[in-house]
Amino acid sequence: MTLREMLTAEKWDYVTIQQASPKSFKIETYRPYAQNLVDYIRRHAPQAEVVFHQTWAWREDHTRMGMDQKPRGFMYRELTKAYHTIAREVGIKRIIPVGDAFQLAAESPEWHFERDPDFDYENPKYPELPREKNSLNGGFRWMSRPGKAKETQPGPGAAQPDDGSDKVFYNDGSHANGAGSYLAACVWYEFFFHDDVRKITQNPAWLGDRAISLRAIAHQVASEGIKPAAWPEEIR
């Protein structure tokens, strides 16, 4: 299905757009493409409000693009400035503040992430993993080494190697984990339906009472306009 087919399939109330996460903090990557996309949407779905989805900053220890070497809060500040600047340029009036929610959570005592001090990250031993209680991102896991599975695929009935020789220790510090996805979902729900997510009384079994604090954070950014401490001064 093409974009045009999707835009004309129904009379949409909203169409949301976002920048790809690895480019989200580079404002030059939005131009002229954001304007072109918004113009296209408005041409084929003129009744819909175009809304920006503010993506989130990667976890502070994510090594991709050298992000772990940047000052704390760098990615959040830059992507926030980019979304708000481009929104003004293309005439988008509202931004879903998911990135604000992630940052506000990261600044809170309950969800501030610190690496496991007892884990040897330089010499990990398969299948051990660090404790990552407060992470909102995927975090560390063992993955099949690229190309290794095909090269060493055992025959029928053969045992799979269990010594980790076919695995690589990988940190997914960009994608949301279950807690991060729950937080984002709460922000989206309250943003669009104007219904206080703090009224929800049922918690996901795997998250338990910690869901309460995530709902509170979602309400703060979606309805109360609370900004993280790292919010860029340029757009205050």
Where do the language-model regions lie?
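Charged/polar positions on well-ordered alpha helices
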Residues: 89, 183-186, 220
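Generic hydrophobic/packing signal
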Residues: 18, 92, 187, 191, ...
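Short, hydrophobic/amphipathic alpha-helical patches that form generic packing surfaces
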Residues: 179-194
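C-terminal accessory extensions appended to soluble enzyme cores
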Residues: 190-236
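Alpha-helical cap/lid subdomain in secreted, periplasmic
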Residues: 3-178, 199
